[in-house]
Curated annotation (Swiss-Prot):
<dbReference type="GO" id="GO:0043123">
    <property type="term" value="P:positive regulation of canonical NF-kappaB signal transduction"/>
</dbReference>
<dbReference type="GO" id="GO:0000209">
    <property type="term" value="P:protein polyubiquitination"/>
</dbReference>
<keyword id="KW-0547">Nucleotide-binding</keyword>
<dbReference type="GO" id="GO:0016567">
    <property type="term" value="P:protein ubiquitination"/>
</dbReference>
<dbReference type="GO" id="GO:2000781">
    <property type="term" value="P:positive regulation of double-strand break repair"/>
</dbReference>
<keyword id="KW-1015">Disulfide bond</keyword>
<protein>
    <recommendedName>
        <fullName>Ubiquitin-conjugating enzyme E2 N</fullName>
        <ecNumber>2.3.2.23</ecNumber>
    </recommendedName>
</protein>
<feature type="cross-link" description="Glycyl lysine isopeptide (Lys-Gly) (interchain with G-Cter in ISG15)">
    <location>
        <position position="92"/>
    </location>
</feature>
<dbReference type="GO" id="GO:0070062">
    <property type="term" value="C:extracellular exosome"/>
</dbReference>
<dbReference type="GO" id="GO:0000724">
    <property type="term" value="P:double-strand break repair via homologous recombination"/>
</dbReference>
<comment type="function">
    <text>The UBE2V1-UBE2N and UBE2V2-UBE2N heterodimers catalyze the synthesis of non-canonical 'Lys-63'-linked polyubiquitin chains. This type of polyubiquitination does not lead to protein degradation by the proteasome. Mediates transcriptional activation of target genes. Plays a role in the control of progress through the cell cycle and differentiation. Plays a role in the error-free DNA repair pathway and contributes to the survival of cells after DNA damage.</text>
</comment>
<dbReference type="GO" id="GO:0005737">
    <property type="term" value="C:cytoplasm"/>
</dbReference>
<dbReference type="InterPro" id="IPR016135">
    <property type="entry name" value="UBQ-conjugating_enzyme/RWD"/>
</dbReference>
<comment type="pathway">
    <text>Protein modification; protein ubiquitination.</text>
</comment>
<dbReference type="GO" id="GO:0043130">
    <property type="term" value="F:ubiquitin binding"/>
</dbReference>
<dbReference type="GO" id="GO:1902523">
    <property type="term" value="P:positive regulation of protein K63-linked ubiquitination"/>
</dbReference>
<dbReference type="GO" id="GO:0031371">
    <property type="term" value="C:ubiquitin conjugating enzyme complex"/>
</dbReference>
Length: 152
């Protein structure tokens, strides 16, 4: 971790010492700005029982710039596109240096519990979510079984 800003070292140490329930985030052995993240599908959500792999990268400008985060596991969600990019305000225009890696991961976990089809990244999924929520939830469950179980 030599050469890393103290803030990143402190945040990493805290993530490892006090993990967030349902979230595992470990820095890559060769690049401490790159994290391997696993988020458990929240209880009572269509993603329950799934484990979702994400990658999180801290740019040089961090904490002045938001981390780059994307899903590596396929997920049927109105706020995640086919490339795994996430539509979340704090990853874009609502980012503040006061926020931390931990906050970002908790926000992504919350997004799994409460998809927001009114601010979509995947328009087709959002449309399905708005016109036939029961069917969208069933598809999300099916994708969770297909892509997010037994994948770790």
């Amino acid at each position: 971790m030599a050469g890393l800003p103290r803030r990143i070292i402190k945040e990493t140490q805290r993530l490892l010492a006090e993990p967030v329930p349902g979230i595992k985030a470990e820095p890559d052995e060769s690049n401490a700005r790159y994290f391997h993240v696993v988020i458990a599908g929240p209880q009572d959500s269509p993603f329950e029982g799934g484990t979702f792999k994400l990658e999180l990268f801290l740019p040089e400008e961090y904490p002045m710039a938001a981390p780059k985060v994307r899903f590596m596991t396929k997920i049927y969600h109105p706020n995640v596109d086919k490339l795994g990019r996430i539509c979340l305000d704090i990853l874009k225009d609502k980012w503040s240096p006061a926020l931390q890696i931990r906050t970002v991961l908790l926000s992504i976990q919350a997004l799994l519990s409460a998809p927001n089809p009114d601010d979509p990244l995947a328009n087709d999924v959002a449309e399905q979510w708005k016109t036939n929520e029961a069917q969208a939830i069933e598809t999300a469950r099916a994708w969770t079984r297909l892509y997010a179980m037994n994948n770790i």
